[in-house]
Amino acid sequence: EAAAPSDDVKISIFYNEGADAIDTAKEMTQLAGYYITNDMCKEDMDNVMLQIERLPSKTPVMVEMKGPFGSFFYNSKLSGAVISQSTDIPAMEKLVARMNTKGFYKIARISSLRDRSFGEANVTSGLYMLSRAGLWMDTGGMYWLDPTSASTITWISSVVLELKEMGFDEVLLDDFRFPDSDAYIFSGDKPAALQTAATKIMEACSSNKFVVSFGVSDPTFALPDGRCRMYLSNVDAGSVAATYAKVTVSDPEIRVVFLSESGDTRYDKYSVIRSLNVAEEVENRKAE
């Protein structure tokens, strides 16, 4: 099990150009950054742009580039890609361009196995209802893909490689899990299926300067070899230490990242990507 990181572990600090900022050309290191959702961009892109201007070079910044409906929030060139009609694509392009010129450690976040559009167009790649009448749909109206399907692996890998070519340093495959339901057909070993899929995606996409990461629900998930991380969501500050203790991967202070909407200080000793909405709170506390 993983021991909590010591207090003297170097962590990248926002608004800090010093030695603890991330050098994207070197080894993976502990993360302390912000995430930007598509909803944030649609609601107030001016505020998003203002907030990122305050961040120093090499800050880890994550931006959502593809959602669970399957829509892309950028002009993907992939065959079959559905471009979001409710997203200001030129504004997103401007955001990504500014992330480049600011020299951020850039993370693209995509919904991976939860993908309504790809499921509709490629039914045999999805998880079927028990009746086999069609694909199983979750309460949000989304389809889920079968990680043992070759076309699922090819599709996800293609998206990752496109974002890699766009200059992202890391891609997070969100919802890299099975849905929590017994109303669909899957008779295999679910943890093994996910680990095999992760290995295949790593083989297709990884390099010595690029990180592929997996948004999982199980802290005991076994990461494949190579430059990769696991991200854990919906872990409240009171549970973060107990959750971290369940992790079995090597170098957990670097390879296990918590996604949090909160500025709570109990996340500080771990790798954490927080909502951009708490930047002011976190930075004011640091300045005290």
Identify the residue ranges that each predicted region occupies:
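Aromatic-lined carbohydrate-recognition surfaces of secreted/lumenal glycan-active proteins
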Residues: 35, 105-115, 172-173, 191-234, ...
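Glycine-rich, aromatic-flanked loop segments that form ligand/cofactor-binding clefts
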Residues: 60-65, 87-136
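Polysaccharide-binding and catalytic clefts of secreted carbohydrate-active enzymes
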Residues: 137-222
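Active-site-adjacent "subsite" loops/lids of carbohydrate-active enzymes
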Residues: 22-41, 113-161
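Boundary/entry segment of secreted carbohydrate-active catalytic domains
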Residues: 2-48, 52, 212-216, 231, ...
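Substrate-binding cleft of secreted/luminal carbohydrate-active enzymes
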Residues: 227-288
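Catalytic domains of carbohydrate-active enzymes, especially glycoside hydrolases
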Residues: 44-72, 162-174, 227-231
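Aromatic-lined substrate-binding rim segments of carbohydrate-active enzymes
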Residues: 5-18, 69-111, 181-209
